[in-house]
Amino acid sequence: MAKPAKRVAVTGAAGQIAYSLLFRIANGDLLGKDQPVILQLLDLPQAQAAVKGVVMELEDCAFPLLAGVVITDDPKVAFKDADVALLVGARPRSKGMERKDLLSANAEIFTVQGAALNEVASRDVKVLVVGNPANTNAYIAMKSAPDLPKKNFTAMLRLDHNRALSQLAAKTGKPVASIEKLAVWGNHSPTMYPDFRFATAEGESMLKLVNDDVWNRETFIPTVGKRGAAIIEARGLSSAASAANAAIDHVRDWVLGTNGKWVTMGIPSDGSYGIPEDIIYGVPVTCENGEYKRVEGLEIDAFSREKMDGTLAELLEERDGVAHLLKN
């Protein structure tokens, strides 16, 4: 007996990240190889023809799990009964644009999308914001959807998490899949703090394997933080395939579970680790039965506190920068 199809809404459907994302969702990488999906694709009116072209390609893959596709420029159509919403589309920063202008341009998009989710999405909708500034965009959407549980709104730090994993694997020679208990704290921006104090690889302490505090502070943390900029510099385009892969990882783990393994998600704070409530902040979590749970009680040393407070300061500044645009 086939499962009933799940509805997956994707915004920015004509964009580069979506182009790497949609085929994998239709292939079952997001929700499982036995779960049919209906894709509900949102983009601007001027991008509708491009979305139609992507849909033609999706059709030409003849994916057994793709049960239907909706193309629209109306958030209320895109988010209707959505089980998962991947908010990929955002206003990119153009040359000479101040950060506050970027924040207000995105606040406009995410208040509308949050309100539409509030009105028409499934009450259990799992929302992942990929479009930058992701944490604050997720905060805006959450605040614009008062009837949905706050825990439904998350921001993507999985790309930072995966970048940190690959740097640690390269440094230690350990297989990337063997590394456990890595955390990435804070904002999805160069201020985030990748933290391997608790990490292990094949049962060995990552701190002992690396044994190089200067590398941690001067190479590892900046490399992970500035990796996106390094890719733009090398390729002339932003990281789209790796971002799409991280989005798949984030939602798949949220839905299907992590078997006790730590992953990083940007989630609304409950006040723990000294982070004010509701701020969407990257923390280590485990997932089971479709729910995430923050890893509690980790010791925060002085260096970590400084890094965690630094990324928090940026998030508070962003929050205050959009406060006047939010109703509640």
UniProtKB/Swiss-Prot annotation:
Catalytic activity: (S)-malate + NAD(+) = oxaloacetate + NADH + H(+)
Keyword vocabulary terms for this entry: NAD, Oxidoreductase, Tricarboxylic acid cycle
Active-site residues, record numbering mapped to chain: H188 (proton acceptor)
Keyword Repressor: no
GO terms of biological process kind: malate metabolic process; tricarboxylic acid cycle
Family: Belongs to the LDH/MDH superfamily. MDH type 2 family.
Role noted for this protein: Catalyzes the reversible oxidation of malate to oxaloacetate.
Protein name (record): Malate dehydrogenase 2
Biological source species: Burkholderia vietnamiensis (strain G4 / LMG 22486)
